[in-house]
Amino acid sequence: PLRDVYKRQSLARRILTTLQGAGLAPADLGSLFNGDGRIHIGYSGLNHLGWLTSLNVDGVDVLPRLLERPDLIESFEEGRLFGADLVQALGAVPNEYLHYYYYSRDDLAVDRKAEAPRGAFLEAQQNQFYTQAQHTDDVAGLWEATRLEREETYMATNREVSGEFERDEADLETGGYDKVALAIMHAIANDVPAELILNVANHRALPDLPDEAVVEVPCRVDGAGIHRLPTPALPDHARGLVVNTKYVEQRTIDAAVNRSRTAALLALSHHPLVDSVHVAEQLLDDFADAFDGLEYLKDAHA
């Protein structure tokens, strides 16, 4: 998804800007992802489940300079979300969605107290936007206000667990989807190289996963298309979670394609955030009751 690709690029940009501000990285780097070979991001994992493990500038990994400084770690959003102690222990900067895995009990407790689940909030907000858009000449302004509210409340319950900090103004900027989409199109159409973190077929980039699995890794994009760059090995602490989550994704696909309750049960019962087979079974029954076309989820022989 383009929004998430943009966020990986933004994470690297924030880290590099932080190091430049502290005099720990060159100040004359120009555009971060212009494909000139000066900057290489070491990132590997799956969509919503990856770790930034290195940030090479002119052949030198500058990420250890960040990891030595708790004050620098907690100067940007992901660092505040996870805390300097955990980031230093991991030796990598996690994707923000890993908060649900590292702090699952805490996040669940806060989510249960929330006025509404995130999905319900977004559905209501979007419906309100469409209704109001029919009665205003400033649709662009209305959308910007809607988008800003969405960004301001993004991962609000997770931030509550981590100290209730507010998002920085720079993290609220728009342009995620379009910037990445245009960067890819520009690189291909004009044969102007760019380095981006993209979701592509694995093809041995991560040897623990099947070749056909979709992974999130650094790529070079140019007039000849998309090319995987050398991908850092998954950290030891990450390998099990990634392999397990990919198994869940594959069984979910099996369930949908083959209309199989068995595959769906395997998927849900092996998901790290589902703590009981009984819970998985109840979820499947609830899905079957709530959505048309999922009746097969109640067929124990499917």
Annotate each predicted stretch with a short phrase:
Residues L32-A302:
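Long, compositionally biased stretches enriched for glycine and/or charged residues
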Residues R8-D36, S54:
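Rossmann-like NAD(P)H-binding beta-loop-alpha module
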Residues P1-Y6:
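Short, small-residue-biased leader/transition segments that mark boundaries at the very start
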Residues K7-R8, L46:
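An acidic- and aromatic-residue-enriched active-site/binding cleft used to recognize and process polar
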